[in-house]
């Protein structure tokens, strides 16, 4: 699968890299003065802002706001299709995170740095980012997760939650 991405490169990169995964769009925080620019300047790092399958440019054509409104989330069709093929949609997205990590690592000049990636997952991209970090902890220097469920116990205790099928 082809995944869209934007690369932000500082004038003098230090060899550090951030994989930035937003739950709505790779360009969401890319505006001047936005979170991506701040990350790039703070760490003098290359930032790869990418979209996982079903997010941003790879969303399907139907009107997701109306189709999946409520408990199941916007990706309900894709989630059920994944299960029909014997796979988990979260698992597929986790594979996307790991593939993007490999791409970034392979194209990174480390200049003595660890070569590990700083991973940022936000919203719908946070859970696949969490799974990728759990499956390949040696790949990541740090992991930051924003706007996701607080605990799995919260999902079990709540019979219905927003976007529960995407979790």
Regions found by a protein language model. Give the residues of each.
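A generic local structural motif
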Residues: 5, 33-34, 130
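Short beta-strand-to-loop junctions in surface cap/lid or active-site-entrance loops
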Residues: 5-14
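Short amphipathic alpha-helices and their capping/turn segments at secondary-structure boundaries
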Residues: 9, 36-40, 133-135
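Short, glycine/serine-rich, charged loops/turns that create anion-binding
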Residues: 12, 25, 124
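Cap/lid segment of the alpha/beta-hydrolase catalytic domain
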Residues: 15-107, 152-159
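Primarily recognizes the serine-hydrolase "nucleophile elbow" in alpha/beta-hydrolase
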Residues: 100-166
């Amino acid at each position: 699968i082809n995944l869209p991405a934007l690369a932000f490169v500082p004038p003098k990169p230090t060899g550090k890299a951030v994989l930035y995964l937003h739950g709505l769009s790779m360009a969401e925080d890319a505006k001047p003065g936005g979170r991506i620019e701040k990350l790039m300047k703070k760490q003098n790092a290359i930032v790869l802002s990418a979209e996982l399958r079903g997010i941003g440019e790879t969303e399907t054509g139907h009107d997701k706001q109306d189709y999946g409104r409520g408990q199941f989330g916007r990706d309900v069709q894709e989630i059920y299709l994944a299960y029909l093929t014997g796979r988990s949609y979260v698992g597929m997205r986790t594979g996307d995170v790991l593939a993007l990590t490999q791409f970034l690592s392979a194209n990174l000049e480390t200049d003595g740095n660890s070569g590990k990636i700083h991973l940022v997952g936000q919203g719908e991209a946070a859970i696949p980012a969490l799974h990728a970090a759990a499956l390949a902890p040696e790949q990541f220097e740090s992991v930051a997760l924003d706007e996701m469920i607080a605990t799995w116990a919260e999902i079990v205790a709540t019979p219905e939650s927003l976007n529960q099928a995407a979790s």
